[in-house]
């Protein structure tokens, strides 16, 4: 087998006919500017060809079930292995997917509980064990031989009646004593029982002192008792009947209530199977309900003015119901909802119960008619309409008022009562899945089961332990197995898939990864790199697209693509060892690695104003422990901490949702907190995340940034367009008129090929240009609308520099490092980092008041050192205009340039959720228990760290005292 992967003539996207050789079975890092062509080489060329060749080796029948990748634009590749791609895409949007299910650990847990689990009665907590007569006798012989005992057989349990027939049958069978409701009687002296009261009747089978010489007699007595008691028997002291009885069962059931289970199966522990799922929530762990907080959208308004949408004066039918209610209960329909008595509000929302109310209805003829009936209530009315409607539009409209809450039946565990009451080492399956992975691993390391259970469990526990260990190795020890897959970040999802691949133990495979270090603290980086080298050492080729300095330094082979982005990239600037990259004059990466270029620390940090602070008190969502957060206004603040320490919960789920609801009038669910103060300092809050800017190929940077509207207006003002009477709508590819109707403005026609990949061919009418011939005849400075959409931002800026409405938006795209993007590039082809920067550009192009609160979550994703430098300039520009910028970030180059750093920790999950230190980067670097500070100290001048910053240490402490809780 060849020792090299030979690539000849790679021209995918912006690659410029690359010829290169990559060593197999090594760790290869591909780096370079954002948009330089790294992903085009790694994913769209190497991975695509490896995957395509493997799939094409399968039968035509098998191929129709697999998505076959498009053949990359390359002359020749040899030395490829079957390829596995691990990208930064959210794992699943299925609400049933959890960390446990996607790693398959949950499958092993189900098997473990089915094979060695100990079921217990949910009511009485007795183990459900079937015992033999010998086991029962042996147990009785261990009791106190000085005590007198009686053996009882339950005949009637908690049933109403006089039960005269039961006593007659017992008498006929020769029994002389019975116990009725806990009292002993001779069978002929039993009092008449109360007919309407529940009774328990037990036959006394034998009375004895436990001694070895009565073993045979006891065995016969037990057989009689079990036959009479339908498999149940109990032993009770004769002298003190208040003592706890010893219960026995020959069936797999509870000796008290006869609760039983069939044989345990793995399906019983699956929340995706009817056998195991909670019947109330169908295994989802949450139930949907119409939320009064969403139904009453304006509690400050009156019912007549629109407190509840659709039940005000504008809707005659529903308003006449409210008017009749007001008359019956004597409340004012013009009074605000908040001022109405609680019982009145409850009646309006949930109905009048059994109380009949006189309602006045308007007839079609304009008259009035009266009817007396109960009031249904607004919430039950919505529930009924949601249930009965067949209209998707009505259902979608009503869904706006629906919220979810933890299922009251299963408490969010998703499993039914039987599955929730099976134990291994005194822990149920739901109790295990809520443990952080680190703690779960510790549980299995110390798990000791005796006898046959231990023999069966040993192999299953080994598999579970290995898989949990892999998750710990990739820095995910803070996650829980019940965590929903759709709540994971892209980086977490990618590392979970990476852990699964290590678990698979494949050899001779080519792995292609996209920035696995995203969302990972520097402390966990070493473990991740250890994981990658372990994959390599198994005999695999590991190709990583990465910007992290540690990863680049640890690579066996480095490939630097550039020199610029987009059309200015696609070339190999340098390749080889770390030393070769650092020495290469054309390598921008080498310049940063060697220290010839660096991101500078600001000469002067902006001090916080203790009188202008945003104070958030008592934040306790997820793992936060009553955190008190203080954000200085008008500064660039970094939120740091190890993965899972609570950064996203504190900023995204608490601060942003709270500020957006208060300032922007949004209605996001807010994580729990005590109080907030200082929101009046801001007039707008903007969250810039990495979600896509559009989910269809029709979305693009021009439409998202709002540039397409002035563009279309400009083309409509061209003399030829005015002469033809064309409006701006003529130049939209989304509506009829100017677009090509053959492809409906897509420019491509989809041809389904069944077992081959779907083929998208250029429309043969417009030849991929989206517009009809008449529209394309309109030109501005020699370019038609399609030519403009095909331009890069950089070229378009030269063309439109005299048009302020367009130029301003183009300039901000250049500022955030997206000069290489095409204006009409499909939003679905943008990476998460590119999408985030398009959003940032849109915000920058708006006129800001200098009182905006910007929140960014890991904006350096996908960014090279050079791109980070440009991004920091943009964020400092926002800060200098008076805005407040909050960034959740692990990148040390960003953290060291911040004005203020708030470090959470000390660890992830349950061992995190506290603010360790708040202050300048120098203050954080000097903190002895801060993981961030430990790594940050290496980048700051030693004198600064020891002095805790450029200011007087006393002044620093005073500010920190004011700011920090």
Curated annotation (Swiss-Prot):
Family: Belongs to the ABC transporter superfamily. UvrA family.
Zinc finger extent (C4-type): 254-281, 740-766
Primary subcellular site in the record, as a coarse category: cytoplasm
ABC transporter domain: residues covered: 311-588, 608-937
HAMAP family: UvrA
Entry protein name: UvrABC system protein A
One GO term (biological process): nucleotide-excision repair
Gene name tied to this protein: uvrA
Taxonomy of the source species: Bacteria, Pseudomonadati, Pseudomonadota, Gammaproteobacteria, Lysobacterales
Species, as recorded: Xylella fastidiosa (strain Temecula1 / ATCC 700964)
């Amino acid at each position: 087998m060849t020792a090299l992967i030979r690539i000849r003539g790679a021209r995918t996207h912006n690659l410029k006919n690359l010829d290169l050789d990559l060593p197999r079975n090594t760790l290869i890092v591909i780096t370079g500017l954002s948009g330089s062509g790294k992903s085009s080489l790694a994913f769209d060329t190497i991975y695509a060809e490896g995957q395509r060749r493997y799939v094409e080796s399968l039968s035509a029948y098998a191929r129709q079930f697999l998505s076959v990748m498009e053949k990359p634009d390359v002359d020749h590749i040899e030395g490829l292995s079957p390829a596995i791609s691990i990208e930064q895409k959210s794992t699943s949007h299925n609400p049933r997917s959890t960390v446990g299910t996607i790693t398959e650990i949950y499958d092993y847990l189900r098997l473990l509980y089915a094979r060695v689990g100990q079921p217990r009665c949910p009511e009485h907590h007795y183990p459900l064990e079937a015992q033999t007569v010998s086991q029962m006798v042996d147990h009785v012989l261990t009791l106190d031989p000085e005590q007198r005992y009686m053996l009882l057989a339950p005949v009637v349990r908690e049933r109403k009646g006089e039960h005269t027939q039961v006593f007659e049958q017992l008498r006929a069978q020769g029994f002389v004593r019975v116990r009725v409701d806990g009292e002993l009687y001779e069978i002929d002296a039993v009092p008449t029982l109360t007919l309407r009261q529940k009774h328990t009747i037990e036959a006394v089978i034998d009375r004895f002192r436990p001694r070895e010489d009565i073993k045979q007699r006891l065995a016969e007595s037990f057989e009689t008792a079990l036959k009479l008691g339908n498999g149940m028997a109990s032993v009770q002291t004769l002298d003190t009947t208040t003592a706890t009885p010893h219960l026995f069962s020959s069936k797999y059931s509870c000796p008290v209530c006869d609760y039983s289970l069939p044989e345990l199966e793995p399906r019983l522990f699956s929340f995706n199977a009817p056998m195991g799922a909670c019947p109330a929530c169908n295994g989802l762990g949450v139930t949907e309900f119409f939320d009064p907080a969403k139904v009453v959208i304006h509690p400050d308004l009156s019912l007549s003015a629109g407190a509840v949408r659709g039940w005000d004066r504008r809707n005659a039918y529903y308003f006449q119901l409210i008017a009749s209610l007001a008359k019956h209960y004597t409340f004012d329909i013009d009074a605000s909802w908040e001022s109405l008595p609680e019982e009145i509000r409850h009646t309006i929302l949930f109905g009048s119960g059994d109380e009949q109310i006189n309602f006045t209805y308007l007839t079609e003829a304009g008259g009035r008619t009266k009817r007396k009936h109960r009031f249904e209530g607004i919430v039950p009315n919505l529930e009924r309409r949601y249930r009965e409607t067949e209209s998707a539009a009505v259902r979608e409209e009503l869904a706006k008022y629906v919220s979810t809450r933890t299922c009251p039946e299963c408490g969010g565990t998703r499993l039914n009562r039987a599955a929730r009451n099976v134990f291994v080492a005194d822990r149920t399956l739901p109790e295990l899945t809520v443990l952080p992975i680190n703690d779960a691993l510790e549980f299995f390391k110390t798990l000791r089961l005796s006898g046959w259970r231990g023999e069966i469990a040993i192999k299953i526990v080994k598999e579970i332990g290995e898989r949990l260990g892999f998750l710990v190795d990739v820095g995910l020890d803070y996650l829980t197995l019940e965590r929903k897959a759709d709540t994971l970040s892209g980086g977490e999802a990618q590392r979970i898939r990476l852990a699964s691949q290590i678990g698979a133990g494949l050899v001779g495979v080519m792995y292609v990864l996209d920035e696995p270090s995203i969302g990972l603290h520097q402390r966990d980086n070493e473990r991740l790199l250890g994981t990658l080298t372990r994959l390599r050492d198994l005999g695999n080729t590991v190709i990583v697209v990465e910007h992290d300095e540690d990863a680049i330094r640890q690579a066996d082979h480095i490939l630097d693509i550039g020199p610029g982005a987009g059309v200015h990239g696609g070339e190999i600037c340098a390749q080889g060892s770390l030393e070769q990259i650092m020495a290469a004059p054309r390598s921008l990466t080498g310049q940063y690695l060697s220290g010839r270029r660096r991101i500078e620390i600001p000469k002067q940090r902006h001090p916080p104003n203790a009188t202008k602070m945003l104070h958030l008190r008592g934040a306790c969502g997820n793992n936060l422990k009553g955190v008190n957060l203080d954000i200085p206004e008008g500064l660039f603040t970094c939120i740091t901490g190890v993965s899972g320490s609570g950064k996203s919960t504190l900023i995204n789920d608490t601060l942003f949702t709270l500020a957006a609801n208060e300032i922007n009038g949004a209605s996001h669910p807010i994580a729990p907190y005590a109080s907030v103060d200082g929101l009046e300092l801001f007039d707008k809050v903007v969250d810039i995340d990495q979600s896509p800017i559009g989910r269809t190929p029709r979305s693009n940077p021009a439409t998202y940034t709002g540039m397409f509207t002035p563009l279309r207006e400009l083309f409509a003002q061209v003399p030829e367009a005015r002469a033809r009477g064309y409006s701006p709508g003529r130049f939209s590819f989304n509506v009829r008129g100017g677009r090509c109707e053959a492809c409906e403005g897509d420019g491509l026609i989809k041809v389904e090929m069944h077992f081959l990949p779907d083929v998208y061919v250029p429309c043969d009418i417009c030849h991929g240009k989206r517009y009809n011939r008449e529209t394309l005849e309109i030109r501005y400075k020699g370019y038609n609308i399609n030519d403009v959409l095909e331009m890069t931002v950089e070229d378009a800026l030269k063309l439109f520099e005299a048009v302020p409405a367009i130029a301003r938006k183009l300039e901000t795209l250049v500022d955030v490092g997206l000069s290489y993007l095409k204006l009409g590039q499909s939003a679905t082809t943008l990476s998460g980092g590119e999408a985030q920067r398009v959003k940032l550009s849109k915000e920058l192009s708006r006129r800001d008041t200098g009182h905006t609160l910007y929140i960014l979550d890991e904006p350096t994703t996908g960014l090279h050192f050079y791109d980070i430098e440009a991004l920091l300039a943009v964020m400092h520009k926002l800060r200098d205009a008076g805005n407040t910028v909050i960034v959740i970030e692990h990148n040390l180059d960003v953290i060291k340039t911040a004005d203020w750093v708030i470090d959470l920790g000390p660890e992830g999950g349950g061992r995190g959720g506290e603010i360790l230190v708040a202050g300048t980067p120098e203050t954080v670097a000097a903190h002895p228990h801060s993981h961030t500070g430990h790594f940050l100290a290496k980048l700051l001048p030693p004198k600064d760290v020891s002095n805790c910053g450029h200011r007087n240490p006393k002044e620093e402490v005073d500010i920190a005292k004011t700011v920090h809780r």
